Amino acid sequence: MVRRQFAIAVQAAVCALTPGCTTVVGGSPAPADTRGPLSQAPVAVTALDALLLDDRKVNDILGAGMRVRYRTQDMWDSSQTFSERSCLAMAGPAQQAVYADTGWTAVRGERLDDSYDDPNVRNDSVNQAVIAYPTARQANAFYDASVRRWSACANRRFVDHPPGQPEVAWAVADSHKVGGTLSTSEEQEGSEDGWRCQRALTARNNIVIDVAACGSFLPGAAAVDVAQQIAAAIVTR
């Protein structure tokens, strides 16, 4: 069976990538940690590209052999293929409609996968994005809203149906908030190889970090590890 990726890939790279991974979570909403250095100088937009992990670091986390498929300075948009707009935040990272009217100023995103030899077969994929806000308080406010949004979309079934392709259904799990990082996991229904995805989101200073990782044999917290490694670089700047 052709494995499908997060729905974010539908509109990117002229539909060169397969959409899918609608991640949704549950649990009790909890506020972001606002005890951090909110007066810290904001990370500049010019520094965003350097925050994304390089392929070597991402491959070390997943135990994979991925390469960068593309980079983007635009939000992704899965609103035309995802079954429930109110839970579009769970369709994948950096969704245009999810971040609309939240005050963000810039985004940098990147897709990595290992499908270069056969575009129909992917063992692993990662989408990572960093989104800048004018202030740390605005970034934390988005994180708090995301905790509530992911909770409202928890433990449910969602469908992604891109034009001309079979629909893909995802069974979603509960959400977890550990150390200021929000995470969830989901499994593709009917997958012959146990294809599943993880999501993670956190905020550091004025930056929101939004990550998705997919694979048949994902390490336990791959998406969280990617997000936290990005966050660590922001903290030390």
Give the role of each language-model region.
Residues 73-77, 150-195:
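Short Gly/Thr-rich strand-loop-strand
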Residues 126-130, 202, 206-215:
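Short, well-ordered beta-strand elements
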Residues 17-20:
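C-terminal motif of bacterial Sec signal peptides marking the signal peptidase cleavage site
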Residues 110-144:
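A short acidic-to-branched-hydrophobic micro-motif
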Residues 22-114:
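N-terminal "mature-domain start" segment
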Residues 114-118, 196-203:
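Short, surface-exposed beta-strand/loop micro-motifs that present aromatic residues
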Residues 1-13:
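N-terminal export and membrane-targeting signals
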Residues 212-237:
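Surface-exposed amphipathic alpha-helical segments
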